[in-house]
Amino acid sequence: MKIEQTLSIIKPNIISNNFIGNIINRLEQAKLYIIASKMIKLSWKEAVSFYIEHKNKSFFSDLINFMISHPIIVQILEGENAIKRNREIMGNTNPKIALAGTLRSDFSNDIIKNGVHGSDSEESADREIKFFFKKDRIFSRI
């Protein structure tokens, strides 16, 4: 199996509902190790820059307004097939159709306020990790 790193974001609704520990516990139980983590409040400019690929989609402004509404936790997860495994743990982007037992099914009920974000490919993970973390702030387990 391949050891990978992926970006994970715990979104504002999880923070405001005090479910942070629940999310981290599930990730740790899945043997996804947190190798960098910080709580931040995104500016409008940062949120637009991070989600630029969605700029022409109908939900873009709702997503940006949500992501700047409260702090978020950004973290780097490391483990075997971390990208795929994190996405499986998160569940479908739409919590209403996410499988029971996934993070989105258990902790959210709205497609915009869906609780968590995870990189969807190695390229995305690399870009997203660099967006939030300097190399000297990442402490790999390998």
UniProtKB/Swiss-Prot annotation:
Main location: cytoplasm
InterPro entries: NDK-like_dom, NDK-like_dom_sf, Nucleoside_diP_kinase, Nucleoside_diP_kinase_AS
SUPFAM superfamilies: Nucleoside diphosphate kinase, NDK
Sequence positions that bind ATP: 11, 59, 87, 93, 104, 114
Enzyme Commission number, as recorded: 2.7.4.6
Active site, per annotation: 117 (pros-phosphohistidine intermediate)
GO MF annotations, alphabetized: ATP binding; metal ion binding; nucleoside diphosphate kinase activity
Cofactors demanded by this protein: Mg(2+)
UniProt record, GO biological process: CTP biosynthetic process; GTP biosynthetic process; UTP biosynthetic process
Gene3D superfamilies to which the protein is assigned, alphabetical: Nucleoside diphosphate kinase-like domain
Pfam families: NDK
Keywords tagged on the record: ATP-binding, Cytoplasm, Kinase, Magnesium, Metal-binding, Nucleotide metabolism, Nucleotide-binding, Phosphoprotein, Transferase
UniProt-listed PROSITE patterns: NDPK, NDPK_LIKE
Catalysed reactions listed for this entry: a 2'-deoxyribonucleoside 5'-diphosphate + ATP = a 2'-deoxyribonucleoside 5'-triphosphate + ADP; a ribonucleoside 5'-diphosphate + ATP = a ribonucleoside 5'-triphosphate + ADP
Subcellular location: Cytoplasm
GO cellular component, one term: cytoplasm
Assembly and interaction partners: Homotetramer.
Family, as annotated: Belongs to the NDK family.
Stored HAMAP family: NDP_kinase (MF_00451)
Function statement: Major role in the synthesis of nucleoside triphosphates other than ATP. The ATP gamma phosphate is transferred to the NDP beta phosphate via a ping-pong mechanism, using a phosphorylated active-site intermediate.
UniProt name for this protein: Nucleoside diphosphate kinase
Source species: Wigglesworthia glossinidia brevipalpis
Gene this protein is translated from: ndk
